Swiss-Prot record:
Protein's job: Catalyzes the NADPH-dependent reduction of glutamyl-tRNA(Glu) to glutamate 1-semialdehyde (GSA).
Domain of life: Bacteria
PROSITE patterns: GLUTR
Binding site for NADP(+): 189-194
EC number assigned by the record: 1.2.1.70
Protein's name according to its UniProt entry: Glutamyl-tRNA reductase
Length: 420
């Protein structure tokens, strides 16, 4: 039995190719069933996200297995093999185990340490459970990988520092203000970045969120999700004085918030400090605003500096995480190798049980026919001893005859022979 991980990801293939080999949730059952029909496949899990498509498999035989499965992947998605040739990778046994643990821990992600991938791996595992495509080895491997991912996040700082613009903006706000629970925050725009910012802020239970957008309709959906008030861009001048923090990200070609607008807001606020974070390109907030007292203005470049520093911290945490993966993958492989002896142990025990039953049956019959019980027991013990030592004795003699000292010593050790 061997384990195999095979696939493509954001590092090896462009999005155009990743799209071609992705698996939709609607077809996952069919894909797993089809995969199990392939020669030597004992179990399989398909992980398909926007950044990767990977097959995790337990196989009866590893001979040319990755080539056969690459062919299956091409046939299933109706693409030519040459399209995958330079993009596909595969890992066997220990490397496959380490790879899954790294993936689940966010160590192989586009954004190092991102937590979403663990949920996606768990979903792939659940699909395989639902469609009965798991082997016992894969089930054990995935469960182990989940515990490794949890250990990585608990014992390292891999997820502690912001590495996205949205998260960095929220981190900056928390650094400047001790608590966000008493603050009003104005978000300008309603695109993807502002959506992420709004969700991060809601998690920190801010007092109030106001969303300003060109059209109220687009902003209303997000407002409903995070319990926010919606205004139009033209209402910003009137509402700006309420805001302790302003985070802006629109596609406007011209600034939306000018120096005069902020001066009026500060006057109404009696010069209480304001934090303005401009993550738009071109900028939404006039740069001259940074000259005003009690105003802290940060641009996307300032956030990038924070993000780069945090990336470096995550890289340091990733080194610790890699040590955890190395340790845990080694332990899993010890368990997996031990499973290779389970069948042999079971067969050996069954053989011994058959011998015991056979000898006991003969002894009982002799005693029932009037034979002396003590003589029967003596005879039985000698016969049992001879039967049990016959095969090991022949093996020892053969190893000695062949001059195979290594095998001879191994046999001696396994039989508990400690003296020459």
């Amino acid at each position: 039995m061997t384990l195999l991980a095979l696939g493509i990801n954001h590092k090896t293939a462009p999005v155009a190719l990743r799209e071609k080999v992705s698996f939709s949730p609607d077809t996952m059952g069919d894909a797993l069933n089809n995969l199990l029909q392939q020669p030597a496949v004992r179990g399989g899990v398909v992980l398909s996200t926007c950044n990767r498509t990977e097959l995790y498999l337990s196989l009866e035989d590893k001979e040319n297995s990755h080539e056969q499965l690459i062919s299956w992947l091409c046939q299933y998605h109706q693409i030519e093999p040459h399209e995958l040739k330079n993009s596909v990778y595969w890992h066997q046994d220990n490397q496959a185990v380490s790879h899954l643990m790294r993936v689940a821990s966010g160590l192989d992600s586009l954004v190092l340490g991102e937590p979403q991938i663990l949920g996606q791996v768990k979903k792939a595992f659940a699909d395989s459970q639902n469609y009965h495509s798991l082997s016992s080895e894969l089930e054990r491997l995935f469960q182990k990988s989940f515990s490794v991912a949890k250990r990585v996040r608990t014992e390292t700082q891999i997820g502690a520092n912001a590495v996205s613009v949205a998260f960095a903006a929220c981190t900056l706000a928390r650094q400047i203000f001790e608590s966000l629970s008493s603050l009003t925050i104005l978000l300008v725009g309603a695109g993807e970045t502002i959506e992420l910012v709004a969700r991060h802020l809601r998690e920190h239970q801010v007092k109030k969120i106001i969303i300003a957008n060109r059209t109220k309709e687009r902003a209303q959906r997000l407002a409903n999700e995070v319990d926010a008030e919606v205004i139009t861009l033209s209402d910003i001048d009137e509402s700006l004085s309420q805001a302790d923090i302003v985070i802006s990200s629109t596609a406007s070609p011209l600034p939306i918030i000018g120096k005069g607008m902020v001066e009026r807001a500060l006057k109404k606020r009696r010069n209480q400090p304001m934090l303005l974070v401009d993550i738009a390109v071109p900028r939404d907030i006039e740069q001259d605003i940074e000259k005003l007292s009690n105003v802290y203005l940060y641009s996307v470049d300032d956030l990038e500096a924070i993000i780069q520093h945090n990336r470096e911290q995550r890289q340091a945490a990733a080194i610790e995480a890699e040590h955890i993966v190395q340790q845990e993958s080694g332990q899993f492989m010890d368990w997996l190798r031990a499973q290779g002896a389970v069948g042999a142990i079971r067969e050996y025990r069954d053989s011994a049980e058959m011998l015991r039953a056979e000898m006991a049956e003969k002894a009982i019959a002799l005693i029932q026919n009037g034979a002396d019980a003590e003589k029967v027991i003596q005879q039985l013990s000698h016969q049992l001893m001879n039967r049990l030592i016959h095969t090991p004795t022949k093996s020892l003699q053969q190893a000695a005859s062949d001059g195979d000292i290594e095998r001879l010593n191994l046999l001696r050790e396994s039989l508990g022979i400690t003296h020459n």
